[in-house]
């Protein structure tokens, strides 16, 4: 458990078109999520990764036993990563222990809809911190809630695909953006 975080109760793994993902929760809501591993079919890799992030927290093997909001979120994330145009359901994010600046970055990032992008600098400007583009990038690099907090929609200056610390790196970021662009009626590559 991260310092200052509320306890995580359990996590579920679920399949998507891009590979296995996971959602973790506790009494405070969603405590974390995991985008597909590089070896997207490797359930053991997912279990190891979740065990590293949430030591001692059990995997919920029956998704029907997860809270209703987590069940709905897993279905929506799978649909989104399968190329469907869906708005993810609103879930409580456990922000205990999240530094205030990072919480502000996540709140502003949540305003970006499918197919929309913004640069790190534009996001910093929206936060009233126009010289904080690098700090915005670092905050998004710490994002424990991807893709619920859609950090993949924040890009480098000029639309460059930079700064994606999730498994698969910038290639995964580009795949996710391409799926969303097609879903909203675009042709793929955003830039």
Tell me the role of every PLM-derived stretch:
Residues 1-130, 179-191:
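Basic nucleic-acid-binding alpha-helical/helix-turn surface characteristic of O6-alkylguanine DNA
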Residues 157-191:
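…primarily DNA-binding HTH/wHTH and HhH modules…
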Residues 147-154:
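Short Lys/Arg-enriched helix C-cap and helix-to-coil transition segments
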Residues 132-146:
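Regulatory, non-catalytic segments
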Residues 113-116, 144-147, 159:
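Histidine- and aromatic-rich ligand-binding microenvironments
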């Amino acid at each position: 458990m991260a310092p200052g975080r509320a306890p995580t109760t359990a996590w579920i793994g679920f399949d998507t078109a891009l590979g296995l993902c996971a959602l973790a929760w506790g009494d405070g809501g969603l405590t974390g999520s995991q985008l597909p591993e590089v070896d997207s079919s490797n359930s053991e890799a997912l279990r190891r990764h979740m065990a590293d992030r949430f030591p001692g927290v059990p995997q919920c093997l029956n998704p029907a036993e997860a809270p209703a909001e987590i069940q709905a979120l897993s279905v929506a994330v799978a649909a989104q990563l399968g190329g469907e145009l869906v708005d993810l359901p609103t879930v409580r994010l456990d922000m205990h222990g999240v530094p205030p600046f990072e919480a502000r970055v996540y709140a502003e990032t949540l305003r970006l809809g499918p197919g929309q992008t913004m640069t790190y600098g534009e996001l910093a400007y929206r936060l009233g911190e126009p010289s904080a583009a690098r700090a915005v990038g670092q905050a998004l690099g710490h994002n424990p809630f991807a893709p619920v907090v859609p950090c993949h929609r924040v890009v480098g200056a000029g639309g460059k695909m930079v700064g994606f610390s999730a498994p698969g790196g910038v290639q995964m970021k580009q795949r996710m953006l391409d799926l969303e662009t097609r879903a909203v009626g675009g042709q793929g590559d955003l830039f």
